[in-house]
């Protein structure tokens, strides 16, 4: 089959009616295709008749749209082209609706017959036959179609009025004839054409002066738009009210038929012959109108992706450019038709200009019609000549108002000059052909802009200015810094639309700023490469400032020039200022570089001549605390440029804000302060050297030529003398010499005008109205003022002042008026405009009259689209107006008045939340919303935190921000972006540039949305995580109410307006297919709702109430039928590191408060949740005589804010801020390269220490809980300590810590199944591999002795962190072998955890330090535990994994456990805090990790300091050879070899660490401002000194101040006061012995004499102490406990005796038995007949019977395992004690008593005997012999006679 333009329709009819075609169609119907949809397959089988009709319509349309001759094989036409056509138009969702409309439209268009389909043909049997109801409206359309050609034939040349009247008359007549119900139902129809007239009249007011001669074109286009819109509205209203059941594409029928008729007539009547190409071109234009109107008002059955961004001009741009085969297609393609042309223009006018250029070229080639109007219109629209001329006039006004131009104004003027020169260049080269008038217009504009530029760039402000924006490129030589700066300059010039002459290249060696003309960009290449005076660094300081800065200029006319450039770009090999730069403060130089870029080459990437940036890497650095930190690293130039643009825009906003807040702004001043200076300038400019010599000798009344002024047809030369007298000499306007003087006077006039503006001698009235006085027509030939200022009444008030103006002032103002072409009341712009209109209006009108109608319609369509502003506003309102009765009502209200109704607004700032974009912007209801809707705090949070937009050109896409530098977006837009593109991210608070990388956008399975992740995105608060419903499919019911939230850009105002609407949603579980052009994607489950969504709605959020809070449940992605919307459910996204498990007990704040870098207050515990904390100290002050007259500066710490010691002091109202202050400011990031090197060096040392027997696998839970017997450093977990949160909440009275969650005998313990700890442990082991676990710690004040200054001067109590029990268990499992290795190898490694200070280890430590010399740094850190960052912790995890190995799972688990410490939640009383740094003190690895961190810091500092000092490389690689380091937590000693002392000293170390936010001081004198080397004997370590006893022995005496405090305060937690004091006294004597044996001897004697109860045998002699130390030195046992209090822990001491399970049952009496606990659990002692008494069994109360008695005794020192005296007195001797009462009660009920124990039965047996005697089960006659014999063998129990006499006698 052959198709060609102008083909007779009979040929096509013959083709589809032939038998051969019928046979091929039958064969085609019989052959099924795999890609056939279900509906299409059914049609082929059941309804081939419909497909026959569709093939006929397909061929008819193929023929009518043929552009050139095309021939197809019949089989290929059917099986390929027709098949693809059916696949595109028949879908399972839309079924045959679109196909039927296509057939009806084609047959009505070609045959003027309406095709009716019977009920069988419809898809649903319930569909009502529409033939009757639609007949009237169908006849209306066909009649309208037939009328238009006839009417056009009558009035081919009719004007605007006849067009409107004819259309309205026939339109109303047909409605009345065929569908009178329309007038009854819709009275607004009568107002349609009245409003069309209003639209055209309004457009005429707004119409550009250039278009005054083409109103007829505008009328054509407006009538087509209005008619199409009206038909679409009528049709939709009829559907809404049920008068017809479906659309008949009336708009398409109307516009296509009307145009065809018009073409047929114009072929015969027009001046130019209309050919088929012009018909096709015009058909495309009006078809675009039909498409837009149909999509707006005709519901589509197909589910369409609603980010189409299509309008009339977009459709025209797509189809006309393709059809005309012009170069527009090559302008770039991005996403949609809109973006094909978007790169060529920035607004609608530009697109229209390009289209008119296409049409102009098209008709010139086809018709030979060389249209001046089309050529001129194409240029004027595409280049926005009108706006260009307006801006030039605006610049003139700015100069006259201020007598100078600011740098911002100057940038605008420069862009205008560049644009004008570009247009002039195009005209000169012949690229653009326009009429002479337009050419002259552009030339005049260029001349005026250049003239203003020449003069204004010498006039600048002398007030406070914007600080210039500085980009500083640093790097080694030959890395391309200069090329990079040049590239940045080019891109900034393009961004600002200025030319290359806007860049000034500064040579710092030049004392003058030669050639500086206030260029906005200044560049300095090879900054500071050459020594200059002053230095380049010194010159930069005043330049980058807001203070006025006059610069040194060579020429006299340039004197007074001030620097005000806004951008500076430098390249340099030097990062820091030179020492010879003579800068007193280096920070002043550093702070002046806003973007500091270190340029380096990518290793392994070759140089590319086509793009030198491909092998460059850019490190953005900032100076922070004495150190340069790499903030960001960019691998591509595009990312760097986006960052620079973002920083530039923020800098400009900041400067504008700062300038706007300055009060008392300094008044402007000109360059001249008196008249004499003005005269001197005139003399210097206008006279040669000889005359100037004579003038010096001239008298004051000698006249001097000053300037020439133009006035109408004359040139007046003005002469002044020193007295201010003026004479005028006229000259002819044609005299060449006079013209030269006039042109040369322009600069002088500008200077003189500035003098008048700012000279105080100028009359105040004149200065006020100076800009209005600049007018050539206001002065006669003698410069008398003849004008009028303001109203006549106002002018009369100031006339006297104006008449008194000196003659020379009037001459200046008249000359300025001539110079700037200002006459009468008009500006330069109005004058140019009126001249052009007078000349070209009639020319255009005459030309347009002769055009063929199709060309009028094409051009009119384009013009009406641009100018119909009010129409498009109404159109947008009606498009969004909903369905049904709501739609009809909105249409009626719209046509009742010419103004668009606004929906009621909502303001979200009724809630107290953080700043966001919507605070001062009303949130509006959607147009189709009927009722009100709620707006609570959750919605405000969603809009302010999560809602954002991505702008690309003029395209704006809504996106959903997700915590973790991510956003969710719709696929049908973002999947079409295949190349990197620079976009703008607009959030609620700000906007920033970003380079979108399509490789980082990943679609979710079976969903239309995807996730984009990029580290260069700015993150949102992580508290927003709870605003998402991550499990919508399970959480949401099938039907629910929700709100649709959107925020789209208003293209008119340029602002974002949030909108909302309530919707009723349904979970749609049937698959849908979302289409957008060729894009198709299947979505299995969707949210469906009734909503009149429109294009650009994609990205709107569906927010519903989930539980008690509103959450985001869906993301709008498509619409269907004009009334249905579809949203994707929010898929699950892996969360970022956030603590979640304990949040059930928390109430979070909407906004974080007291937020600092490392810590923030985020919430509080819920009401009723209480975490017990100590409020009373366990430290008891001893009696005065016990203190032995020794000094003590330490007292118990403050544990509560209500401490009575603070009452009445300034600290009475102190808060708990002391605990988090150490986390407020973590250390600065470290250089990753050097940190990795340091870590690798440490790991290599670890490997050097590994023995064959060392293993690092994880241990079992049993080993983690119980330790390993006989293996050093593998002790069991302390069970007396707290169990952590949230387990502590379930603790009952009498239960203690971790012990209530374990069971077993004394040696083998295990977790009790079913407890909260056991469940949390199991969950943690499962989840640990996947993510960093939740970690919630309790901050508990530490009960310890502190110096008085930390109590009264500045209260500061240390806290320790209690972590959950299950977390500590898992940590022990994964790291116990590593900890054992580090402690065991302390003799070789720097870490000294486990050192025994009494042993020879101390001597070995001293020798290690002295091996490098006796110059030692003794250091102390401030807030050490809060310094560590995730960077360091992550590196530490790598180090441990490198040593310990294991599979990927185990290494990942270790990493997650360590990282959990650096991102956790902390509970301090009722407050919940987020902590993002540091190591919690309750972490099992705290001391080990702190030790490793301490060593890393010292090694890192060593590496950096030696590198900076350029020390020999051998020193860098030999840390162990030159440094001897020992660390224990935050304690360290650093012995420095004399070779490296010049590079690594205390002062250098202190300064370097301070630059990283780390404060380090002298460990001995913490108040010292310096850190100096000390001798070993002057240092301390672990609060112990180094004392040399002999050549081979060093001892470690503890600081005496710490010793004396032990005698003033004792801990009575586990001991009685006397026993606790005795323990402390023995320890003090042992320590004091190391200081001096004689001093220890004197103290022992004094204690025995002063303390009465003290026995000599209780206190060891000096000989015994000496033997103690001798024994310690020969032992190699570790000291795994940090202080004496831990040594007294019952978990470590246990009950005296061997900890072996007892298997003996001991009967004291038939009513009293001692047995092992296991016998009870075996059922041998049933609770109904026995009273079980558990003694120190550690069983949880919940695991024991209610009747059981639990006895937890506190063992006394030296009491043979029995409890303390106080406990015996209160529990045993006291007959009314709780235990005694329960025993007697049980005996009264006939029960027997059984004492149960898990370990040594001896102490429990004694207790059983004592209780038995006390409660008369046993008699003293029986117990006396037994106890007497026992005392003979166990002397330590002799106290029983005195304490328990009842056991011996009655």
From Swiss-Prot:
Catalytic reactions of this protein: RNA(n) + a ribonucleoside 5'-triphosphate = RNA(n+1) + diphosphate
Gene Ontology BP annotations: DNA-templated transcription; proteolysis; viral RNA genome replication
Keywords: ATP-binding, Covalent protein-RNA linkage, Helicase, Host cytoplasm, Host endoplasmic reticulum, Host membrane, Hydrolase, Membrane, Nucleotide-binding, Nucleotidyltransferase, Phosphoprotein, Protease, RNA-directed RNA polymerase, Thiol protease, Transferase, Transmembrane, Transmembrane helix, Viral RNA replication
Presence of keyword Ubl conjugation: no
GO cellular component, one term: host cell perinuclear region of cytoplasm
Domain spans labelled RdRp catalytic: 1414-1544
UniProt KW RNA-binding keyword: no
Active-site residues from the entry: 972, 1008, 1098
Protein name, UniProt field: RNA1 polyprotein
Source organism (scientific name): Bean-pod mottle virus (strain Kentucky G7)
């Amino acid at each position: 089959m052959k198709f060609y333009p102008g083909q007779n329709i009979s040929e096509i009819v013959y083709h589809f009616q032939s038998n051969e075609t019928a046979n091929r169609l039958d064969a085609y119907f019989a052959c099924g295709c795999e890609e056939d949809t279900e509906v299409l397959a059914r049609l082929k089988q059941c309804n081939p008749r419909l497909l026959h009709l569709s093939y006929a319509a397909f061929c008819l349309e193929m023929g009518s749209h043929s552009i050139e001759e095309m021939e197809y094989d019949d089989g290929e036409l059917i099986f390929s082209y027709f098949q693809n056509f059916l696949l595109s138009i028949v879908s399972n969702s839309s079924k045959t609706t679109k196909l039927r409309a296509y057939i009806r439209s084609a047959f009505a268009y070609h045959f003027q017959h309406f095709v009716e389909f019977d009920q069988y043909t419809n898809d649903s049997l319930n569909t009502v036959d529409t033939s009757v109801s639609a007949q009237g409206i169908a006849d209306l359309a066909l009649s309208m179609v037939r009328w238009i050609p006839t009417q056009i034939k009558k009035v081919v040349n009719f004007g605007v009025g006849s067009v409107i009247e004819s259309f309205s008359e026939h339109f109303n007549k047909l409605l009345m004839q065929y569908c009178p119900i329309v007038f009854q139902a819709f009275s607004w129809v009568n107002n349609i054409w009245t409003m069309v007239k209003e639209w055209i009249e309004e457009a005429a007011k707004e119409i550009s002066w250039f278009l005054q001669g083409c109103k007829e074109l505008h009328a054509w286009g407006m009538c087509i738009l209005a008619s199409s819109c009206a038909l679409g509205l009528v049709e939709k209203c009829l559907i809404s009210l049920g008068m017809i059941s479906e659309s008949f594409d009336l708009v398409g029928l109307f516009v296509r038929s009307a145009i065809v008729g018009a073409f047929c007539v114009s072929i015969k009547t027009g001046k130019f012959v209309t050919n088929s190409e012009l018909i096709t071109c015009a058909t495309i234009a009006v078809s675009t109108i039909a498409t837009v109107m149909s999509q707006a008002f005709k519901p589509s059955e197909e589910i369409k992706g609603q980010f189409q961004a299509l309008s009339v001009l977009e459709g025209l741009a797509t189809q006309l450019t393709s059809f005309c085969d012009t170069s527009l297609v090559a302008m770039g393609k991005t996403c949609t038709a809109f973006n094909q042309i978007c790169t060529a223009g920035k607004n609608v006018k530009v697109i229209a200009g390009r289209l008119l250029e296409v049409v102009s070229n098209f008709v010139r080639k086809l018709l030979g019609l060389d249209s001046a109007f089309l050529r001129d219109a194409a240029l004027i629209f595409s280049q926005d000549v009108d706006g260009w001329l307006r801006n030039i006039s605006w610049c003139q006004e700015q100069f006259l108002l201020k007598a100078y131009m600011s740098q911002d104004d100057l940038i605008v003027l420069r862009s205008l000059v560049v644009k004008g020169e570009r247009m002039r260049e195009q005209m000169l080269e012949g690229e653009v052909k326009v009429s002479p008038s337009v050419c002259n217009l552009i030339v005049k504009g260029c001349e005026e802009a250049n003239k203003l530029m020449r003069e204004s760039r010498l006039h600048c402000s002398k007030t406070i200015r914007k600080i210039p924006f500085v980009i500083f490129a640093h790097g080694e030589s030959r890395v391309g810094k200069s090329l990079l700066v040049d590239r940045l300059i080019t891109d900034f010039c393009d961004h600002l639309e200025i030319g290359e002459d806007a860049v000034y290249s500064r040579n710092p060696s030049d004392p003058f700023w030669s050639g500086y003309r206030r260029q906005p960009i200044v560049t300095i290449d090879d900054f500071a490469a050459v020594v200059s005076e002053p230095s380049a660094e010194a010159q930069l300081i005043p330049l980058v400032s807001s203070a006025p800065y006059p610069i040194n200029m060579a020429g006299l006319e340039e004197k007074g020039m001030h620097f005000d450039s806004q951008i500076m770009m430098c390249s340099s090999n030097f990062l820091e200022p030179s020492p010879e730069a003579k800068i007193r403060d280096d920070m002043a130089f550093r702070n002046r570089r806003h973007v500091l870029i270190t340029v380096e080459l990518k290793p392994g990437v070759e140089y590319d001549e086509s793009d030198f940036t491909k092998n460059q890497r850019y490190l953005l650095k900032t100076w922070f605390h004495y150190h340069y930190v790499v903030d960001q690293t960019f691998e591509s130039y595009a990312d760097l440029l986006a960052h620079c643009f973002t920083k530039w825009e923020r800098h400009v906003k900041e400067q504008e804000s700062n300038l706007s807040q300055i009060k008392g702004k300094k008044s402007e001043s000109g360059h001249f302060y008196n008249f004499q200076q003005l005269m001197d300038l005139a003399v210097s400019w206008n006279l040669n050297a000889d005359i100037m010599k004579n003038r010096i000798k001239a008298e004051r009344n000698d006249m001097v030529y000053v300037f020439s002024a133009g006035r109408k047809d004359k040139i007046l030369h003005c002469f002044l003398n020193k007295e201010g007298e003026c004479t005028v000499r006229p000259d002819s306007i044609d005299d060449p010499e006079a013209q030269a003087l006039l042109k040369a006077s322009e600069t002088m006039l500008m200077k003189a005008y500035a003098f008048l503006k700012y000279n105080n001698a100028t009359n105040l009235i004149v200065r006020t109205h100076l800009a209005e006085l600049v007018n050539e027509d206001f002065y006669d030939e003698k410069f008398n003022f003849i004008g009028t200022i303001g109203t006549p009444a106002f002018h009369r008030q100031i006339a006297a002042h104006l008449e008194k103006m000196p003659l020379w002032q009037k001459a200046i103002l008249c000359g300025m008026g001539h110079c700037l072409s200002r006459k009468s009341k008009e500006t330069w712009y109005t004058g140019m405009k009126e001249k052009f209109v007078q000349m070209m209006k009639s020319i255009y009108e005459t030309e347009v009259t002769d055009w063929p109608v199709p060309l009028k319609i094409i051009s009119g369509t384009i013009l009406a689209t641009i100018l119909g502003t009010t129409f498009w506003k109404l159109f947008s309102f009606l498009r969004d107006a909903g369905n049904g009765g709501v739609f009809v009502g909105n249409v009626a209200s719209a046509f009742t008045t010419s103004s668009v109704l606004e929906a009621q607004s909502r303001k979200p700032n009724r809630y107290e939340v953080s700043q966001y974009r919507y605070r001062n912007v009303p949130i509006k209801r959607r147009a189709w919303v009927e009722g009100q809707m709620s707006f609570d705090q959750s919605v405000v949070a969603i809009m302010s935190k999560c809602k954002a937009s991505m702008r690309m050109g003029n395209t704006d896409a809504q996106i959903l921000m997700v915590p973790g530098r991510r956003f969710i977006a719709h696929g049908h837009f973002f999947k079409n972006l295949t190349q990197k593109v620079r976009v703008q991210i607009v959030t609620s608070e700000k906007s920033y540039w970003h380079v979108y990388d399509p490789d980082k956008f990943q679609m979710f399975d079976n969903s239309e949305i995807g996730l984009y992740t990029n580290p260069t995105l700015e993150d949102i608060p992580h508290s927003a995580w709870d605003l998402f419903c991550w499990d919508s499919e399970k959480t949401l019911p099938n039907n629910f109410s929700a709100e649709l939230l959107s925020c789209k850009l208003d293209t008119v105002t340029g602002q974002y307006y949030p909108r909302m609407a309530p919707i009723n949603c349904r979970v749609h579980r049937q698959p849908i297919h979302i289409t957008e052009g060729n894009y198709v994607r299947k979505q299995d489950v969707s949210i469906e709702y009734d909503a009149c969504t429109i294009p650009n709605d994609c990205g709107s959020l569906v927010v519903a109430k989930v539980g008690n809070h509103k959450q985001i449940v869906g993301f709008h992605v498509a619409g269907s039928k004009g009334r249905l919307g579809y949203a994707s459910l929010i898929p699950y996204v892996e969360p970022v590191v956030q603590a979640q498990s304990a949040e059930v007990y928390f109430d979070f704040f909407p906004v974080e408060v007291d937020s600092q870098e490392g810590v923030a207050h985020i919430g509080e515990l819920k009401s009723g949740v209480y975490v017990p904390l100590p409020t009373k100290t366990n430290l008891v002050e001893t009696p005065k005589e016990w203190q032995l007259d020794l000094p003590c500066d330490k007292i118990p710490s403050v544990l509560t804010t209500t401490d009575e010691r603070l009452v009445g002091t300034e600290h009475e109202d102190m808060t708990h801020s002391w605990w988090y202050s150490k986390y407020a400011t973590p250390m600065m990031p470290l250089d990753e390269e050097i940190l990795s090197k340091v870590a690798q060096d440490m790991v290599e040392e670890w490997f050097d220490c590994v023995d064959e027997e060392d293993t690092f696998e994880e241990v079992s839970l049993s080993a983690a809980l119980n330790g390993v017997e006989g293996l050093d450093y593998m002790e069991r977990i302390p069970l007396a300590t707290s169990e952590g949160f949230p387990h502590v909440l379930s603790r009952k009275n009498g239960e203690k810590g971790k012990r209530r969650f374990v069971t077993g005998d004394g040696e083998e313990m295990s977790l009790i199944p079913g407890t909260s700890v056991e469940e949390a442990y199991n969950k943690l082991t499962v989840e640990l591999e996947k993510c960093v676990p939740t970690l919630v710690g309790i901050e508990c004040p530490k009960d310890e002795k502190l110096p008085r200054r930390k109590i009264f001067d500045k209260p500061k109590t240390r806290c320790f962190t209690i972590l959950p029990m299950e977390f500590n268990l898992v940590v022990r499992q994964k790291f116990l072998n590593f900890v054992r290795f580090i402690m065991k190898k302390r003799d070789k490694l720097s870490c000294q955890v486990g050192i025994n200070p009494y042993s020879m280890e101390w001597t070995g430590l001293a020798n290690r330090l002295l091996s490098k010399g006796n110059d030692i740094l003794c250091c102390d850190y401030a807030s050490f535990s809060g310094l560590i960052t995730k960077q360091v912790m992550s590196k530490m995890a790598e180090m441990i994994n490198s040593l310990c190995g294991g599979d990927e799972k185990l290494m990942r688990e270790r990493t997650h456990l360590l990282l959990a410490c650096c991102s956790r939640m902390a509970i301090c009383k009722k407050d919940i805090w987020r902590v993002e740094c540091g190591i919690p003190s309750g972490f099992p690895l705290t001391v080990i990790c702190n030790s490793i961190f301490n060593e890393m810091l010292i090694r890192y500092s060593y590496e950096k300091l030696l590198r900076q000092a350029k020390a020999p490389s051998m020193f860098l690689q030999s840390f162990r050879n030159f440094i001897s380091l020992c660390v224990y937590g935050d304690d360290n000693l650093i012995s420095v070899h004399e070779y490296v002392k010049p590079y690594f000293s205390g002062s250098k170390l202190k300064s370097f660490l301070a630059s990283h936010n780390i404060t380090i001081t002298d460990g001995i004198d913490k108040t010292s401002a310096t850190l100096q080397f000390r001798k070993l004997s002057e240092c301390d370590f672990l609060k112990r000194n180094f004392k040399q006893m002999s050549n081979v022995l060093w001892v470690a005496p503890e600081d005496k101040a710490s010793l004396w405090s032990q005698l003033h305060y004792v801990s009575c937690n586990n001991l009685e006061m006397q026993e606790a004091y005795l323990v402390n006294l023995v320890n003090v004597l042992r320590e004091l012995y190391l200081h001096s044996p004689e001093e220890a001897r004197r103290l022992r004697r004094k204690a025995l004499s002063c303390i009465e109860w003290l026995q000599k045998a209780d206190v060891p002699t000096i000989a015994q102490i000496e033997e103690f130390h001798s024994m310690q030195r020969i032992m190699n046992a570790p000291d795994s406990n940090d202080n004496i209090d831990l040594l007294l822990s019952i978990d470590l001491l246990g009950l005296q005796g061997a900890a072996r399970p007892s298997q003996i049952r001991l009967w004291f009496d038939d009513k009293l038995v001692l047995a092992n606990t296991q016998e009870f659990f075996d059922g041998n002692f049933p609770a109904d007949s026995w009273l079980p008494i558990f003694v120190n069994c550690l069983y949880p109360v919940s695991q024991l019977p209610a009747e059981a008695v639990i006895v937890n005794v506190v063992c006394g020192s030296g009491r043979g395992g029995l409890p303390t005296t106080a406990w015996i007195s209160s529990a045993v001797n006291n007959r009314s004690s709780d235990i005694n009462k329960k025993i007697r009660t049980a005996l009264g009920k006939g029960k027997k008593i059984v004492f149960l124990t898990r370990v040594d039965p001896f102490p429990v047996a004694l207790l059983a005997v004592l209780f038995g005697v006390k409660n008369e089960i046993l008699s003293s006659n029986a117990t006396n012999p037994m106890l007497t014999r026992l005392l003979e063998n166990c002397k330590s129990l002799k106290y029983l006679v005195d304490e328990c006499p009842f056991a011996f006698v009655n």
